Amino acid sequence: LQTTLSWSEGTEAVGLMIHTDDELRKWCQLRLEVRHGKILMDRYNRVDGDQYYLDERPVVFRDNKAEVKLIVSGNIMLVYVDDVALACRCYEIGIGEVGIFVEYGNVRCTQTRLLEQ
């Protein structure tokens, strides 16, 4: 997945929900925490006892936008946000939906491409 996310002034976080199931009991989430200057990948699994995992990296956001490249291979996820890399694993997450979210603001998703192999 390749996209450009842009957000309004004052937005706290934007991101992508990945591999979500219909009831949102399991998911992976790429969060761009605009206010805190970091990207993080978090995973949640309510099925196996409220398990929560987190990986993060610092990033400097410019002009209220970021280019995001997400590569998924099995349970391995590699993401680039404005050339800052974050790699992690999403165990026990199956095939699901992809979505976009925003916290306390507005987000726009442009130049989006989904590539499958």
Could you tell me what each predicted segment is?
Residues 1-117:
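Extracellular glycan-recognition regions
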